[in-house]
Amino acid sequence: MAQVAIFKEIFDQVRKDLNCELFYSELKRHNVSHYIYYLATDNIHIVLENDNTVLIKGLKKVVNVKFSRNTHLIETSYDRLKSREITFQQYRENLAKAGVFRWITNIHEHKRYYYTFDNSLLFTESIQNTTQIFPR
């Protein structure tokens, strides 16, 4: 249970202050290999380097993920979130409209992979030198 509280705090903090450098540093310090974020439920599945897992259950309302695919909406929504024109909840809803069911962020590869309901890869982005917003 202590790990869940630690990771929840890390994810909450990055949403608040957008300090992604600190976010990645903390994830690496806690031996996170990658995490999977499920847009529909707001759940986060964290996979550690030793293959142990931690689940953070989402507290937000469930959103409906569309079957349409819109990579442009993914990019523009991110830009609007970064400039604080929209909230994380609105960002999440926009990604669901764009057809994103889940994303996987690989900490060591510095990549985020967006997937649809049928597990098709929809979009890939580098997270190395960018300011990103992360779930929770």
Swiss-Prot record:
- Pfam families assigned: DUF1398 (PF07166)
User: From what superkingdom does this record's organism come?
Assistant: Bacteria
The record's comment on protein family reads: To E.coli YcgX and YdfO.
Anything else the record notes? Encoded by the cryptic lambdoid prophage DLP12.
For this entry, the protein name equals: Uncharacterized protein YbcV
The protein's organism comes out as Escherichia coli (strain K12)
Organism classification: Bacteria, Pseudomonadati, Pseudomonadota, Gammaproteobacteria, Enterobacterales
Q: Which gene encodes it?
A: ybcV
